[in-house]
Structure formats: structure tokens, C-alpha cells
Amino acid sequence: MEKIALFLPSLHGGGAERVMVNLARGFAERGLNVDLVLAKAEGPYLSQVPSNVRVVNLGVNRTLYSLLGLVRYLKQEQPKATLSALNHANIIAIWARLLSRVKTCLIVSEHNALSQSIENTTSVRAKLIPLLIKIFYPKADAVVAVSHGVAEDLIARTGLPSEKVKVIYNPVVAPEVFSKANEPLEHPWFQEGEPPVILGVGRLTTQKDFPTLVRAFVLVRKEHAARLMILGDGEDRPKLEALIRELGLEKDVAMPGFVDNPCKYMKRAALLVLSSRWEGFGNVLVEAMACGTPVISTDCPSGPAEILE
């Protein structure tokens, strides 16, 4: 049986991680032997990996430190194809294949607009990523971008030949989305007769710009009774909680944290709002629409404009 390997730093909550779990599940359902190779096997999506996918834990704390472990894995397992996601993991995957000399077909994927990611960080290492991409990405068999905007930005920023970069939208709507959407939800805000709930879903980071959503919610409440719920965790939680207190919204804004099944919230929400400053694709927009929920998004680069009118 042909083996496929998928390589990631971890399964901490993010769109790329969820997409890779979906891919692993889909490949396994089609009869392939699938390994999910993680620099460190941790994160909330770990519980969503199906039993017919083997998790390989390289057991290191940083993606860079996974290089030798990934080289050993490639030599031992000789996968027919290897897929990776997130640019720092992509670079390690390419480097590992070069060192291992294993003839695995290597496909790397970009899930965010590179320019936006670089401009919105102070990390010196992150500023080196475009140079490393120029050096390493041509050595991959293919580079996948999750939207045309991400592809165009990647080509413009790094000078990669356009024929090297292929656009493939994220596999978001798996059959289980619909069964998950119909699971019971006990939260009192979603009971009959309660005010409509506006939903935001994503990591609490600068990219997702939930402060803009909270401030917009203040304007909505001046016209209509409503509540706001934000699903997700991240480093900006303290700032967001402080803003909610400052605006006197404690009774009408809830942040339950990361949830295993956001679909059942989406199905019962009046509206899903994506307030991001930038996106690669916008998985939650597709998920919410699959659940039958109206969506609104900022016109940010890159993905939402390719999903919505």
C-alpha cells in the first residue's frame, strides 16, 4: 500500500492544521497508508485525527529541531509523497529530503499571504523567510497556494516562477461538517426566544482583528438586541477581555475559548463575521455557509474576496 506523509510543527488550533487533518482523513478513507508527522504531537486537533492515520511524534519543541528526526523518518519509511504546510515547516521538509536523498514527491503549501505575515511581525527570523523560500522552494516538486491572492503575493515577494505555484482551495466541507452541525448545543444563548448571536471564530491574534469586531458590535447593539460570541484562544485574549470590560460588554460578549466543534455554534448563529486584517483563504466562511449561516467579511487580502461576492 502506498504511503503518504503529512508534516507539520504541531496540531495547535489553526486553519492549516485543520486542513492537514482533513487531508489525512481523506487520504486514509481512499485506502492510502497515511502518517501525520509532527515536530511535537500536541494541540487541540490531535483528538480529531482518525484512528486509521498514524501519528509520528518527533518529540521536539521547535520545528528547526525536527530536521534530523524527519531525515530519519524519510529514510526509514520511504513515503511515496510528502506534504507539508506553513513556510518554516516547508523549509525543513525540503531540507530533510535533500539530506535523506529519498525520492519522495514533496509538495509544500502556503496558507497565508507572505507579505502580510512578514509586515506584521517584529521577528528577525521571520524577516528571513522570503530569502529562505527563494533558496528552498524551487527544490520542491510543487508549491500549493490556498488562494490566487496567496499565489500572486508569493510569486511577487520571492520571484518564484509562476508555473511552480499551483492554486488549490482548502478542503473544508467534509461530510462530518453536517453531522457536527446537528449535534446538540446546550448554551443558554442559543435557546428559543434569546437575542440573535453574532459569531466570530479564530485564533485571538493580531491577524484576526477581533477588536474591530467588538467595536462594530457596539454599533449593532445601538440598533438591535444582540450578543457576540468569539470562539478561539490566543495571545491577545487579555487585551480583548480588557476592551470588552472597557466598553461595558461583559454581559453580551462571551469568549468560551477553543471548541472541538464550532459547526454546531455556526448552525445556530444569526451571522458569522470574519474581521481579519489578512487571510490565506478563510475556512470559517465556507464552513458557516455549509451550515446555512449568513456571513460577512472584511475585504482583506487574500481569500475572502475569492469566496464571497
Could you describe each region identified by the protein language model?
Residues 17-22, 196-219, 235-242:
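A conserved mid-protein helix/loop that constitutes part of the nucleotide-sugar donor-binding site
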Residues 258, 277:
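Aromatic "clamp/platform" in nucleotide-sugar-dependent glycosyltransferases that forms part
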Residues 6-64, 158, 164-166, 235:
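N-terminal strand-loop element at the rim of the active site
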Residues 64-68, 105, 115-136, 152, ...:
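Nucleotide-sugar donor phosphate/pyrophosphate-binding loop at the beta->alpha transition
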Residues 262, 282-285, 297, 304-307:
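Short glycine/serine-rich donor-binding loops of glycosyltransferases
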